[in-house]
Amino acid sequence: DGFRVDVIWHLIKDESFSDNPPNPEWHEGIDPYRAIVPLHTTDRPEVHQIIASMRRVVDSYSERVLIGEIYLSIERLVQYYRVNLSAVHLPFNFQLLLAQWDARHIARLIVEYEKALPEGGWANWVLGNHDRSRIASRVGRAQARVAAMLLLTLRGTPTLYYGDEIGMQDVPIPTER
């Protein structure tokens, strides 16, 4: 039991509500969210105080977990474990979800993540979620089976998006639904 907090790294904005600067690399055809550099609205230092207070509440109950959805580089992601592990128990590790599907690249990501984990930090791996195309749509059904085997044999907690275990692929959803 516990809580998964969506976009936990977005909880704090800078106090003057400054506009984010335009992304000079953005152009038509790229996700509109990427049109700005979220300098003032994500990964703010103050967010760690909020998360620490959430962690204290969760830790006041036995056997509970606090999970944070955090799309950041490994270097920034591991900061969400914090000193003395005072933040989320599991800052979702989306490296496999975002990686190009190449064995050497994935092997480097695994090693980099494991090396970056703070002492006592528990590894976790995510292959799919509601924000991205399903693994079978991204790499094909045969490779999705390989991906599931990788996910379930890596050290740490695996997160399997419902339907990925049967090779479910993306399908269009009619607007009337």
Regions found by a protein language model. Name each.
Residues 1-177:
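Active-site and adjacent substrate-binding regions of carbohydrate-active enzymes
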